[in-house]
């Protein structure tokens, strides 16, 4: 787990060093820079900050040079690198024990397509001197971030957007802002800045340094036709396969040359991962948060689960002052707007656990892949009602008097799933509480709306959509929350094989009347943990953002979310009505603080944060 940077622009060495310093928390163990002279006399610079996990020897520091012709910067882990060495590289002499060198050797043997064999979370770029090209890729589910700026014959990339921003005059992207107001995140391929894009999950690229041509390709998608599995013939067959895949995913993710632990909230997903980990090693410690607000403290549930598994557990005390400190650090570490304040306690728990371990396993991805959100149940019922009206429309279409009536009706049915999703308020990321934003420009179609239009997928289309969009939010949160304290989080449920197989499972395997949401995961877990320890409503911890905005941060809220700032910086919103909403909230009206957190963080990060040169101070 690291931070990567590269550019064809001619910066002074001090500028490159400052850029790397902006993300040194991602990799405090080593900082490296390589200045490369290309065959046509141009300059290419690679930079890397390393968090040492595999092969701690300095020989594996980056930028890494392989056989003189290949240089690489790499963030993440290729979990199956030992299997790849055995299967493909038996005749290759390697000088390290790192997965970094395996990526290089696999590229030399198989080319760009070698990425299709990697099981992991990664973002990497290779420079091939022989061809004078850069090739790069991002993992299938987008666990690791990758930002880039392509202009003319220049390409610059980094793990975080502020690294590209430093020393450059970038402009805010209005389309990204509109998506942020709707979703609470900036979806791929957008970034806060118009010039900067994200490589999307499952994409790879080739950049020709001589011509400046950038060719981006998709090497993996959620399309079930491309996966290596067949649909199960029974529920028992499906459960056994999911269990086997999860066990193997955990096995791969336990490999490290540094201390490893597990997050354990006491919920279904984290308990499942902790239970599987205990089958491999009962000595690995579990970590949970103990909040001083008893209304939200669930540490006793986690302790009960750990005791039933016979694993050690450490309750990390988290106070209101601790949370406030993390919030004050927001601008430094979370350099892209993110409207979910749960990232604050997530960051704090990671910080506490980092005192003992460098790598930690978590249960992220279970809700998106195995129907863990109540909206799936709501949407199923609503869709059934909606589709009944569709057949009525189709029946009466021949009797429409106006020209084009049939085409109009049939066109409308192509958007059934999107319409139902929108009617349930899923596009407007809880932007209201007791009130609603009065004006949000929907503008352009969302990038991944095509997944909702897939009629053959039925209700599963919603899960496909969440996997391509809201999983971005999960990935961004855990990446920033853990890298803030130089910790690597691994998510076995997000193994691409688990994701592929989950796409083949019918709705009733995911949700049923008795077990409710995430049926198949619960069935697997109940084989290892008593059901009575787990059957309870899911609450989650809500940081006291509302109290902060009404108390010690009240003036800061007024100064930041001001009428002028709303008018000039968030023009999609009605400034008069929003200010009235803000004042009513501060005076005690029951309104969701998330509305103001959304606006506050956007303005802070993009307009009131330090200038690029101040970042390096």
Residue ranges and their predicted role:
Residues 1, 113, 166, 195-201, ...:
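Adenosyl-5′-phosphate
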Residues 99-100, 119-121, 271, 299, ...:
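Conserved glycosyltransferase catalytic-site signature
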Residues 370-394:
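A mobile, often basic/glycine-rich helix-loop segment
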Residues 357-367, 371-373:
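Short acidic/histidine-rich active-site segments
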Residues 607-617:
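Single conserved hydrophobic/aromatic residue that forms the stacking wall/gate
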Residues 1-334, 346, 350, 527, ...:
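Cysteine-centered catalytic environments shared across enzyme families
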Residues 64, 154, 376-380, 617:
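Glycine-rich, phosphate-binding/catalytic loops in enzymes
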Residues 335-340:
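Short, flexible loop segments at the rims of nucleotide/cofactor-binding pockets, characterized by
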């Amino acid at each position: 787990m690291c931070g990567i940077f590269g550019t064809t622009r001619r910066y002074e060495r001090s500028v490159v060093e400052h850029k790397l310093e902006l993300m040194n928390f991602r990799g405090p163990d080593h900082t490296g820079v390589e200045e490369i002279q290309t065959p046509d006399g141009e300059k290419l610079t690679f930079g890397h900050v390393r968090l040492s996990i595999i092969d701690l020897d300095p020989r594996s520091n980056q930028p890494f040079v392989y056989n003189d012709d290949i240089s690489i910067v790499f963030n993440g882990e290729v979990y199956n690198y030992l299997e790849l060495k055995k299967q493909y590289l038996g005749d290759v002499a390697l000088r390290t024990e790192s997965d970094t060198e395996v990526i290089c050797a696999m590229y030399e043997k198989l080319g760009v397509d070698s990425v299709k064999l990697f099981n992991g979370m990664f973002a990497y770029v290779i420079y091939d001197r022989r061809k004078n090209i850069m090739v790069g890729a991002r993992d299938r589910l987008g666990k690791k971030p990758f930002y880039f700026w392509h202009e003319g014959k220049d390409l610059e990339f980094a793990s975080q957007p502020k690294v590209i921003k430093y020393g450059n005059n970038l402009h805010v992207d209005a389309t990204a802002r509109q998506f942020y107001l709707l979703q609470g995140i900036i979806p791929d391929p957008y970034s806060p800045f118009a010039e900067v894009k994200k490589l999307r999950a499952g994409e790879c690229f080739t950049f020709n340094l001589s011509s400046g041509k950038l060719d981006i390709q998709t090497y993996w998608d959620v399309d079930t036709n491309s996966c290596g599995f067949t649909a199960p013939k029974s529920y028992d067959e499906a459960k056994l396969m999911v269990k086997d895949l999860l066990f193997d995913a955990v096995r791969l993710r336990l490999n490290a040359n540094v201390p490893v632990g597990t997050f354990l909230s006491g919920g279904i997903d984290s308990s499942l991962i902790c239970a599987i980990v205990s089958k491999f090693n009962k000595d690995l410690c579990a970590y949970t948060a103990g909040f001083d607000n008893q209304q939200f403290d669930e540490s006793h549930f986690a302790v009960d689960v750990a005791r039933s598994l016979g694993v050690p557990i450490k309750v990390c005390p988290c106070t209101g002052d601790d949370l406030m400190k993390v919030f004050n650090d927001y601008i430094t570490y979370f350099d892209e707007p993110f409207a979910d304040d749960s990232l604050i306690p997530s960051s704090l728990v990671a910080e506490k656990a980092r005192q003992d371990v460098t790598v930690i396993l978590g249960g992220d991805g279970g809700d998106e892949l195995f129907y863990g959100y109540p909206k799936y149940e709501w949407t199923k019922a609503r869709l059934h009602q909606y589709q009944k009206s569709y057949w009525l429309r189709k029946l009466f279409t021949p009797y429409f008097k106006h020209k084009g009536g049939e085409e109009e009706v049939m066109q409308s049915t192509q958007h059934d799933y999107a319409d139902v999703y929108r009617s349930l308020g899923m596009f407007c990321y809880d932007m209201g509480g007791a009130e609603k934003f009065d004006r949000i420009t929907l503008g352009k179609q969302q990038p991944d709306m095509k997944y909702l239009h897939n009629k053959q997928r039925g209700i599963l289309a919603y899960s496909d959509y969440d996997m391509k969009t809201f999983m971005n939010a999960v990935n961004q949160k855990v990446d920033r929350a853990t890298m803030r304290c130089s910790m690597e989080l691994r998510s076995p449920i997000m193994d691409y094989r688990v994701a592929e197989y989950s796409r083949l499972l019918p709705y009733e395997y995911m949700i049923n009347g008795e077990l409710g949401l995430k049926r198949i995961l619960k069935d697997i877990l109940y084989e290892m943990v008593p059901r009575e320890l787990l059957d309870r409503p899911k609450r989650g911890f809500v940081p006291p953002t509302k109290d902060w905005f009404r108390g010690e941060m009240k003036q800061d809220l007024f100064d930041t979310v001001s009428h002028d700032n709303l008018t000039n910086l968030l023009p999609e919103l009605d400034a008069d009505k929003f200010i009235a909403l803000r004042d009513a909230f501060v005076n005690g009206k029951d309104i969701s603080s998330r509305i103001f957190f959304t606006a506050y963080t956007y303005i802070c990060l993009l307009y009131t944060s330090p200038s690029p040169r101040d970042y390096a101070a």
